[in-house]
Amino acid sequence: MKTKVIVVIGPTAVGKTALGIDLAQRYNGEIISGDSQQVYRKLDIGTAKASPEEQAAAVHHLIDVRDVTEGYSAYEFVAEAKALIADIKSRGKLPIIVGGTGLYIQSLLEGYHLGGLVDQEQVLAYRAELDCLSDEDLETMAEQAGLMVEGNSRRRIIRGLELKKFGENLENTESGYEPLYICLTDDRQVLYDRINQRVDKMMAAGLLDEVSWLYQEHPEAQAAMGIGYKEFFPYLEGQISLEEAIDNVKQNSRRFAKRQLTWFRNRMAVDFYQVSEEAVKDRIYTAVEEFLDD
């Protein structure tokens, strides 16, 4: 029997953290963060990490599990999340994944199992490389590789290219999980306004001090490349004004939100929920309860 997993996804600033806590409290669950930046200690504000009060309201995993000097990959996330899901289930609780890093979540929950003769990190690195390509470039690669993909589905093309590259060492089997994807969204302008307001709140909460520490201590770290940090480095070097740096954070965050929505829409079988819609919480509760009772 497959393990049922609730997955709360969506663009930045849409309200994933609050919903995840609500569902964990309501359905006896524990939260696994599906965010590539929230693993880092001391990076709290720019990563929009759940506050100490929020983390006290529900058990959270994969937050503050790496120093900023360490790297973090999809392979590490998959290995650690699998162990956590098994542990949470063994204690009679519901695993709830909350986050916006689509590659990590898809790598965990889609039907890929890596055989013992291939480096798992190598496969995930190749997947990330393919994901950076446009639909047109992927289709060209598929044609050159002699792949016949029904409907030219992006997901199927990537899967086919992986199988072509790694052959029998990559087993194409069903996942051991049964996920319910809850993808939060909102009208674009409303979402963009929320993003802008959140950046302003981050600045008021001390984001610049957090960035300054990172810039002084670990400017070359993988963590420093995240949105909300890298945009301030030119300001700290005297190249742009603080206002320009803040505007760049807002602009990059809006662009990232758009890319996230495109990812979830095109590459994962998700149900969308408009957060500003009346009674949206009731719709989500109904979906979760029907999923758990099935």
Curated annotation (Swiss-Prot):
Chain sites annotated for binding substrate = T12, A13, V14, G15, K16, T17
Region of interest (Interaction with substrate tRNA), residue spans: 35-38
The keyword Nucleotide-binding is annotated on this UniProt entry: yes
Pfam families reported for this sequence:
IPPT
Q: What is its EC number?
A: 2.5.1.75
Report the catalytic activity: adenosine(37) in tRNA + dimethylallyl diphosphate = N(6)-dimethylallyladenosine(37) in tRNA + diphosphate
Give the UniProt keywords, A-Z.
ATP-binding, Magnesium, Nucleotide-binding, Transferase, tRNA processing
| InterPro entries referenced in this protein's UniProt entry, alphabetically | Dimethylallyltransferase, IPT, P-loop_NTPase
Superkingdom as given in the UniProt entry: Bacteria
Q: Name one GO biological process term.
A: tRNA modification
Site note Interaction with substrate tRNA, residues: T101, R127
Residues reported to bind ATP: G10, P11, T12, A13, V14, G15, K16, T17
Cofactor(s) recorded for this entry are: Mg(2+)
In alphabetical order, the GO MF annotations are: ATP binding; tRNA dimethylallyltransferase activity
Q: Which family does it belong to?
A: Belongs to the IPP transferase family.
Q: How does it assemble?
A: Monomer.
The function of this protein is: Catalyzes the transfer of a dimethylallyl group onto the adenine at position 37 in tRNAs that read codons beginning with uridine, leading to the formation of N6-(dimethylallyl)adenosine (i(6)A).
Q: Any idea what this protein is called? A: tRNA dimethylallyltransferase
- Organism, as annotated: Streptococcus suis (strain 05ZYH33)
User: In the UniProt record, what gene is named as encoding this protein?
Assistant: miaA
